[in-house]
């Protein structure tokens, strides 16, 4: 058996077809936008004028109205990412649809990828831990454990094995690199 035949069989076994693979790209963009929307909406609800982009939200004045707004705005992004994963876990529980799985998987993957490869100290979770004066990795660990549990539950419902998760990881890496490249192009 050739390697290409092995991969084709693995993808079929993992229920990954072209539709599922292509869904990952818009899911990646929408996940980034939803995460940033979490920051933006919290800031706006607290009365701050916020500026929104694909991979960043900041105040128009560069200062929040209240010092505590920093913390709440920082929590908004990870909270919305967890909310996304929970909502689509519920959809998976109801529909058992493989087409929904990328939304749950990418929510977990994007926080893991950002924390590990994006420079930990630049991430929301590190900033939140510092503001709460808890261990540097505490909030990141909490967020990642919640998302891991949701991804694990979704994988179990859909009977996806570790090999399938590996293929979704590859698709997620490709998708996240497309988002990062797009952000760099539009941020010039």
Regions found by a protein language model. Name each.
Residues 13-29, 98, 167-170:
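Alpha-helical transmembrane segments and their helix-start/interface "positive-inside/aromatic belt" motifs
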Residues 186-188:
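Short acidic DE-rich linear segments
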Residues 21-71:
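Small-residue-rich helix-interface/hinge motifs
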Residues 1-16:
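Short, Lys/Arg-rich, polar N-terminal cytosolic tail immediately upstream
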């Amino acid at each position: 058996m050739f390697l290409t035949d092995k991969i084709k069989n693995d993808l079929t076994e993992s229920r990954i077809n072209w539709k599922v693979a292509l869904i990952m790209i818009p899911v990646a963009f929408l996940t980034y936008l939803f995460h940033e929307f979490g920051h933006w909406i919290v800031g706006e609800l607290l009365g701050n004028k916020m500026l929104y982009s694909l991979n960043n939200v900041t105040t128009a004045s560069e200062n929040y109205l209240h010092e505590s707004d920093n913390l709440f705005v920082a929590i908004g992004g990870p909270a919305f990412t967890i909310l996304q994963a929970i909502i689509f876990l519920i959809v998976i529980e109801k529909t058992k649809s493989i087409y929904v799985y990328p939304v749950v998987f990418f929510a977990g993957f994007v926080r893991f990828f950002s924390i590990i490869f994006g420079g930990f100290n630049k991430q929301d979770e590190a900033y939140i831990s510092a503001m709460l004066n808890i261990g540097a990795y505490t909030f990141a660990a909490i967020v990642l454990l919640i998302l891991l549990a949701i991804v694990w539950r979704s994988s179990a419902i859909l009977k996806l094995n570790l090999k399938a998760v590996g293929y979704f990881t590859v698709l997620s890496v490709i998708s996240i690199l497309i988002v990062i490249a797009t952000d760099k192009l539009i941020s010039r």
